[in-house]
């Protein structure tokens, strides 16, 4: 698809299939002034001595420089298309006025809970907790893209004088193309591609509707409330022990967490989930399969992600389950998939948004997304004393579905469960995380010591007489590169690594 000029300096380009799916999901809760799958990332920052003066001005300038580097940050959705305006220094300044915020009072959790659907991304600086919070709609970017984007942002802070200060006269060439275009998917489908796509999506949806989940509050007409998350982070020594145990058994950390999640659903899930096998939708990174240069960091600002639906059999033991999952992780990729992306997303949208009677029980499946070692995409330490001490990623959930994220940062494994407060209490989420931890300890013969449990702000106020969570106050020790061994989060495809990409029940 090409850009078409509608007015002088204004260009419009239709959303492609994958973008259209994400955009429709973005608009699905707009009548409630809410956003499903809104992406967020929280960074707790030690700015070092060089950024102690005029910090707000420096952050704002770096945010503008990031916009110049990634003009996709300025795109605005219009119907089922994206709009680009030719920019100059003044328009970039206006964009910053619409997207950069400083709040001296709010916690990161309060920013996320109160976020509304916006046509542009946002960056918040919260001086009370020394936090930077990035928010974006999912049609614009994915999880690993967010990590690479933030790495570029902190690289700008590291050397602000080296960044171009004004946008190019026409930036369309720097705007990352759709997934289908980046993958080189033909615009005209053959009969073989149509057949492959139809069978692929039929099989995907057949498995996806079987996803298992946990009992939820309320009835079928209960409206969503605030998005929330509970998380547990394990010490570097515990993370090392878990990695070593997985390596000894020749399984990945992702497979171990996946199997532990399945066992947790078998024990704590809905009654029908306890009796059935466990199927979940799991995101995979498609960036390694894209054509150059779209497989590079220069194209962080786009959604290049797919999904698989591995199954865990209830009748198997833990090691058998992990072995089966490893096979699923290694065998999912098919070159035909990349070629057939356009009909795949067409059939997927048809199935996803078709008018039908609501199911008797609203879906409440749990999704697993492993981001792996964050430092592969986003450094923790920069020059001049600039450090990202803590990283947290998530999405805003508006349905009864939950999402489990796993990643390591500074050598510490984090498990984070995203949910909506209308359907789950924080105590339920903690119970789920605790059960996953216990399964891992039992099956891998390790002891996992939580560094800190991330508590809701209100409970933290009560326990510590402060409104900031412990996770944003603790500073972990620096971990050697050797500790960064979360290779288990890498899903080896048939030829290239495919990393779980941090999305919900995604389009593939």
From Swiss-Prot:
Induction: Expression is positively regulated by the azaphilone pigments (MonAzPs) gene cluster-specific transcription regulator pigB. The keyword Acyltransferase applies. As colorants, MonAzPs are widely used in various food products for centuries. Moreover, MonAzPs also possess wide-ranging biological activities such as antibacterial activity, preventing hypertension, lowering cholesterol levels, causing hypolipidemic effects, and displaying antiobesity and antitumor activities. Residues 166-188 are annotated as: Disordered. Pathway: Secondary metabolite biosynthesis. Keywords: Acyltransferase, Pigment, Transferase. Its EC number is 2.3.1.-. It comes from the Eukaryota. InterPro entries: CAT-like_dom_sf, PapA_C. One of its GO terms (molecular function) is acyltransferase activity. Disruption phenotype: Produces the angular tricyclic shunt intermediates monasfluol A and monasfluol B that retain the omega-1 alcohol. O-acetyltransferase; part of the gene cluster that mediates the biosynthesis of azaphilone pigments (MonAzPs), a complex mixture of compounds with a common azaphilone skeleton very widely used as food colorants. PigM and pigO are involved in the elimination of the omega-1 alcohol with pigM acting as an O-acetyltransferase that synthesizes the O-11 acetyl intermediate whereas pigO eliminates acetic acid to yield an intermediate with a C10(11) double bond. This is O-acetyltransferase pigM. The gene is pigM.
């Amino acid at each position: 698809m090409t850009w078409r000029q509608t007015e002088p300096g204004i260009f419009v380009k239709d959303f492609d299939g994958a973008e259209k799916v994400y955009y429709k999901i973005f608009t699905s809760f707009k009548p409630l002034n809410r956003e499903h799958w809104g992406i967020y990332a929280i960074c707790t920052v030690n700015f070092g001595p060089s950024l102690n003066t005029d910090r707000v001005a420096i952050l704002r300038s770096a945010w503008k420089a990031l916009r110049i580097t990634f003009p996709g940050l300025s795109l605005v959705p219009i119907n089922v298309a994206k709009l680009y305006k030719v920019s100059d220094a003044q328009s970039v300044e206006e964009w910053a006025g619409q997207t950069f915020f400083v709040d001296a009072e709010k916690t990161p959790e309060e920013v996320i809970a109160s976020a509304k659907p916006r046509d542009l991304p946002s960056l918040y600086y919260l001086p009370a907790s020394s936090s930077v919070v990035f928010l974006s709609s999912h049609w614009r970017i994915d999880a690993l893209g967010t990590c690479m984007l933030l790495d570029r942002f902190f690289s700008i802070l590291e050397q602000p004088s080296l960044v171009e200060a004004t946008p190019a006269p026409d930036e369309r060439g720097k705007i990352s193309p759709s997934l289908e275009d980046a993958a080189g998917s033909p615009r005209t489908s053959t009969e073989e591609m149509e057949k492959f796509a139809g069978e692929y999506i039929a099989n995907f949806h057949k498995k996806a509707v079987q996803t298992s989940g946990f009992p939820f509050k309320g009835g079928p007409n209960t409206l969503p409330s605030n998005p929330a998350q509970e998380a547990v982070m394990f010490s570097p020594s515990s993370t090392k022990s878990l990695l070593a145990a997985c390596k000894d058994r020749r399984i990945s950390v992702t497979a171990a967490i996946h199997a532990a999640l399945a066992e947790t659903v078998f024990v704590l899930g809905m009654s029908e989930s306890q009796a059935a096998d466990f199927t979940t939708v799991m995101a995979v990174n498609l960036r390694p399969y894209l054509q150059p240069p779209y497989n590079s960091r220069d194209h962080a600002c786009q959604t290049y992600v797919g999904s698989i639906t591995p199954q865990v059999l209830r009748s198997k033991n833990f090691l058998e389950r992990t072995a089966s999952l490893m096979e699923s992780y290694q065998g999912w990729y098919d070159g035909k998939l990349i070629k057939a992306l356009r009909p795949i997303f067409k059939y997927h949208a048809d199935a996803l948004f078709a008018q039908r009677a609501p199911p008797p029980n609203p879906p409440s499946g749990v999704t697993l997304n492993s981001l792996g070692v964050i430092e592969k995409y986003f450094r923790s330490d920069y020059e001049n004393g600039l450090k990202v001490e803590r990283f947290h990623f998530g999405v805003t959930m508006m349905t009864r579905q939950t999402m489990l994220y796993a990643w390591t940062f500074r050598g510490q494994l984090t498990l984070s469960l995203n949910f909506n407060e209308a359907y789950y209490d924080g105590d339920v989420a903690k119970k789920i995380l605790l059960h996953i931890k216990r399964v891992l300890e039992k099956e891998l013969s390790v002891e996992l010591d939580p560094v800190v449990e991330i508590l809701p702000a209100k409970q933290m106020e009560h326990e510590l007489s402060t409104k900031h969570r412990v996770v944003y106050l603790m500073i972990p020790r620096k971990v050697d590169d050797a500790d960064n061994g979360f290779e288990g989060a890498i899903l080896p495809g048939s030829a290239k690594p495919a990393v779980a990409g941090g999305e919900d029940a995604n389009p593939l």
